[in-house]
Amino acid sequence: MTDRKKDHIDLAFKSKTGLEEIDRRFFYEPLMAKHPVAGLASFKFLGKTMRAPIWVSSMTGGTQLAGQINHNLAKVCREFGLGMGLGSCRPILQNDEHFPDFDLRDTIGDDLPFYANLGIAQLEDMVLNDDISPIDRLIEKLRADGLIIHVNPLQEWLQPEGNLFSQPPVDTIRTYLEMTNYPVIVKEVGQGMGPESLRALLELPLEAIEMAAFGGTNFAKVELLRSDDFKQQYFGPVSHIGHDAFEMTDLINEILDENITVKCKQIIISGGISSFLDGYYLINRCKLPAIYGQASGFLKYASQSYDELEKFVEYQVEGIKLANAYFVIKDSER
């Protein structure tokens, strides 16, 4: 007791907060709940039962460290009941050399969502050739629940080795949905999406849309950093165009108020989600069932040690429990 009181005195002057620091997204209701003790309530998402509203967003797919990182991620998903999207599976589409790095079903278990991932450029080639059998084999071999399609026109344009699209991605996606029976998620890669793209996807029978919004890892910028100085200077402003997760959530809500037939009814809110408070706020603001995803945060800790990764997820889950008890989101703007 004496030590605690001494700490309070020593730290009091360091703990003053300014009005500019207040988080105006929430009402704080300290009288209305007891401290949360039990775990989060389980819920259905992507056809599986999850125990926390957190998604491991697709990351790197073909590096020397990918195997250990991926297995750490799958292990933590199983421990806490999260879902997971693999990084690009292109390295194992035709060659099994790196397959063990992606073979995670036994690690994550059968009860949680686990998705393969390919770029729209690879999908376009197969759709135009009327042969998606390599994708079917990939999903079956991985025992994945379905496919994430990452749509990345700016990245492909800026990438020296990039593939230029011969038709609008929405046409490729629409045709692929007619050819496959597997669930499909569509995501961007760090720019987010505007209203016309979101509207088009909401009208398709997708399992979910993942935002991959502006504010997180930006793969257009990644490609610029790989290029020469002149290209970086000339095309640099392109990487600053996009939509953050807050804007995209409101765009989706506005589209839902329109008189359209919505077939895609689940959202993974990702891109710039720096804390559990960001995720909690946006999944509660969204009118569709939603969870939140992170990529770089998981990558950081998964590449260090499992203990660090476990603590990272544990604190997020505890934070969501705290938020459920005491924080109510405001309808007003930030």
Located regions from the model:
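Hydrophobic faces of well-ordered beta-strands that scaffold small-molecule active sites
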Residues: I54-S57, L82-S88, F114-L118, D145, ...
